[in-house]
């Protein structure tokens, strides 16, 4: 049985005051949801603050991005070792905004995936298609290609200790949400494709849905057999919304 995971990606948002208020606002719901894992991925500058805030509750900590490098002359980068030192469990990798705005190729994503695992973190591998790719029936090809790029480097068994997040790019920050049927269709395809490589991995790996998840849509989405939770963007910044999403995962 796969444990539902609700993960908030705060992106480039927050202040010292708002970060504290947000954690305090969601911690009771996170602690009460015994069968749901809750995690947050703050901007790097807030990782130490959040680590202290979640030290005595059940909320897990994640990074939004890390470097493939551990140390050295890499201005502006953050290594997986650094975030691990502050108690992080997860790191996102391959988010569509990293792919789009930072030109991260499948090869770069694969290298980061390996570096994340090698340094004791759990990678949350983000995959998904653009609107143009969906409208030209390329969704399945896109997610397979993005997965294969990682598996070719890491091996299929590495996904036993990883999370996959399917995020249709056309639904991120747009207010558009894939219907529960559309999302389940892609999640089921991902799991079936993985089963061709390893039935063990396919049965075990959590596949999250990411793309304008809201409290109003969470319960129906998470009721689908191959949707194991959500990677939540804007709604993760709102206490009531995020609590509602956690409730929807129970």
Curated annotation (Swiss-Prot):
Single GO cellular component term: cytosol
Lineage: Bacteria, Pseudomonadati, Pseudomonadota, Gammaproteobacteria, Alteromonadales
PANTHER family tied to this protein: TRIOSEPHOSPHATE ISOMERASE
Gene from which the chain derives: tpiA
This protein's pathway: Carbohydrate biosynthesis; gluconeogenesis; Carbohydrate degradation; glycolysis; D-glyceraldehyde 3-phosphate from glycerone phosphate: step 1/1
Organism: Psychromonas ingrahamii (strain DSM 17664 / CCUG 51855 / 37)
Functional note: Involved in the gluconeogenesis. Catalyzes stereospecifically the conversion of dihydroxyacetone phosphate (DHAP) to D-glyceraldehyde-3-phosphate (G3P).
Primary enzyme class: isomerase
Name the record gives this protein: Triosephosphate isomerase
EC number(s) recorded for this UniProt protein: 5.3.1.1
UniProt entry tagged with the keyword Membrane: no
Alphabetized UniProt keyword annotations: Cytoplasm, Gluconeogenesis, Glycolysis, Isomerase
Primary location recorded for the protein, binned into one broad class: cytoplasm
Active site location: 95, 167
SUBUNIT field: Homodimer.
Protein's GO biological process: gluconeogenesis; glyceraldehyde-3-phosphate biosynthetic process; glycerol catabolic process; glycolytic process
Family: Belongs to the triosephosphate isomerase family.
Compartments in which it is found: Cytoplasm
GO molecular function: triose-phosphate isomerase activity
Binding of substrate, residues: 9-11, 173, 212, 233-234
Catalytic activities: D-glyceraldehyde 3-phosphate = dihydroxyacetone phosphate
InterPro entries reported for this sequence: Aldolase_TIM (IPR013785), TIM_sf (IPR035990), TrioseP_Isoase_bac/euk (IPR022896), Triosephosphate_isomerase (IPR000652), Triosephosphate_isomerase_AS (IPR020861)
